[in-house]
């Protein structure tokens, strides 16, 4: 457009002053920029509409796990857990994979139970069923005698503290991430939870202390630091049931010891389910359940399972270099 104006005005050059020509170029440049601005805005708007359409489709998807109408809240006083004759399978296209069939497991109140076995044995799936991230097709899962399928999911998950292998931290301060376990906690309670989780020392070394922003998914903290913040959150929540899913498997030796000490504090007085590949993590627990293809093949304390010379003893021997006791 600038070139067009220049050519059109060239024939009458004798009537145009340099100032007028500058003004013409300036106006043309300004108008062109405005059109470019409008064009960019329309492109962004079209992308936003496309993204919104995709999100709407996701939000409109029916919930696979839904509460029954008028479902009561789950109330837990002891933490007794019963998996009774459960059956669970999933379908991928025309293929159906059965994970559990007539599976039974009883965990007494306050008992600490380790789940071990080869990858794909069903360890993590069992914890997800307890958290009701999926519904079983057969049988029932009871917590203190209450069928979790008949209680609200929100009340169920308020009773279970969950510490995964990869800590789930938000792009907020350390204090806010810990307080996610109990939003109305006081600063003193947050600090005490951090102390019990062996996190206070590294937090106080940070320039902003508890006000330090952790970054997206906690990228500004090391793996051991993220895990201790996650444990502090679970301590603050003070739930009667605790689920640990490979909570120390990705840590170095020094961080693992600090996290292991914090977990020992966290497990006191709670019903605990500990999923582990590293058997040293579960050797001190009350019971160890060995799973294979969705079935319990061995069940007992560490010393008994080692003495039996079965699957657990073989796993222990491979991990410890034949040091059995």
In which residue ranges do the predicted regions lie?
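A hydrophobic transmembrane-helix motif
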Residues: 1-28, 81
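An intracellular "coupling" helix at the cytosolic face of ABC transporter transmembrane type-1 domains
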Residues: 1-2, 40, 44-47, 63-64, ...
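Alpha-helical transmembrane segments of polytopic integral membrane proteins
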Residues: 4-5, 35, 52, 200
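Conserved catalytic core of two-component sensor histidine kinases
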Residues: 25, 32, 157
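Cytosolic ends of transmembrane helices, especially the final helix of ABC transmembrane type-1 domains
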Residues: 30-58
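Conserved E/DxxT/N motif and adjacent residues on the DHp alpha2 helix
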Residues: 57, 64, 179
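ABC-type nucleotide-binding domain
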Residues: 74-325
């Amino acid at each position: 457009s600038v070139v067009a104006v220049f050519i059109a005005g060239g024939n009458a050059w004798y009537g145009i002053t340099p100032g007028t020509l500058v003004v013409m170029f300036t106006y043309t440049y300004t108008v062109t920029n405005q059109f470019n601005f409008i064009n960019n805005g329309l492109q962004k708007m079209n992308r936003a509409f496309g993204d919104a359409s995709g999100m709407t489709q996701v939000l409109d998807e029916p919930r696979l796990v839904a509460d029954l109408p008028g479902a009561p809240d789950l109330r837990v006083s002891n933490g007794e857990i019963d998996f009774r004759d459960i059956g669970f399978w999933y379908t991928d296209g025309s293929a159906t994979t059965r994970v559990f069939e007539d599976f039974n497991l009883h965990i007494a109140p306050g008992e600490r139970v380790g789940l071990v076995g080869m990858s794909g044995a069903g360890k993590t799936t069992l914890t997800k069923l307890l958290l009701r991230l999926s519904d079983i097709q057969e049988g029932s899962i009871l917590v203190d005698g209450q069928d979790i399928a008949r209680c609200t999911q929100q009340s169920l998950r308020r009773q279970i503290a969950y510490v995964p292998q990869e800590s789930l931290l938000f792009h907020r301060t350390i204090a806010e991430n810990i307080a996610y376990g109990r939003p109305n906690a006081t600063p003193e309670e947050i600090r005490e939870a951090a102390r019990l989780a062996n996190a206070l020392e590294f937090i106080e070394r940070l320039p902003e202390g508890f006000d330090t922003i952790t970054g997206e998914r906690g990228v500004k903290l090391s793996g051991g630091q993220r895990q201790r913040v996650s444990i502090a959150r679970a301590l603050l929540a003070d739930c009667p049931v605790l689920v640990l899913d490979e909570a120390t498997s990705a840590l170095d030796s020094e961080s693992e010891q600090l996290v292991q000490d914090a977990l020992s504090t966290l497990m006191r007085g709670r019903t605990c389910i500990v999923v582990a590949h590293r058997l040293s993590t579960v050797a001190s627990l009350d019971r160890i359940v060995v799973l294979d293809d969705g079935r319990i093949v061995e069940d007992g304390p560490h010393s008994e399972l080692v003495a039996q010379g079965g699957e657990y003893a073989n796993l222990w021997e491979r991990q410890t270099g034949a040091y059995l006791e």
